Amino acid sequence: MGKTGNIEHVEERVESELMPPSMYKVILNNDDYTPMDFVIEVLQVFFRKNEQEATDIMLTIHHQGKGICGIFPFGIAETKVIQVNQFARQNQHPLLCSLEKA
């Protein structure tokens, strides 16, 4: 019979600290031409806001010049900005959606 060697398993525990993703605010900017109803529609369709939330954000945009639609990781924020800007152009509105670091 062969001699069985003693196999030693060494486990190395590597603790990696996962950093939360950087978050970005998606912002709608006021202009003098985009109808308020269109802004409310954008907030409901792209940001899943109910009618009251959408109206409140729209009024903030109207009175303060801009309003926060939501805070997301960069990839999601960037996608929403692109989608909203394309939708606004398709509907011939100058509404501008942008993002900034939260």
From Swiss-Prot:
Domain of life: Bacteria
InterPro entries: ClpS (IPR022935), ClpS_core (IPR003769), Ribosomal_bL12_C/ClpS-like (IPR014719)
Any Pfam family the entry gives: ClpS
Gene3D superfamilies (alphabetical): 3.30.1390.10
GO biological process per UniProt: protein catabolic process; proteolysis
Subunit and interaction comment: Binds to the N-terminal domain of the chaperone ClpA.
Function: Involved in the modulation of the specificity of the ClpAP-mediated ATP-dependent protein degradation.
NCBIfam families (UniProt xref): PRK00033.1-3, PRK00033.1-5
Protein family: Belongs to the ClpS family.
PANTHER family: ATP-DEPENDENT CLP PROTEASE ADAPTER PROTEIN CLPS, ATP-DEPENDENT CLP PROTEASE ADAPTER PROTEIN CLPS1, CHLOROPLASTIC
Protein name, as recorded: ATP-dependent Clp protease adapter protein ClpS
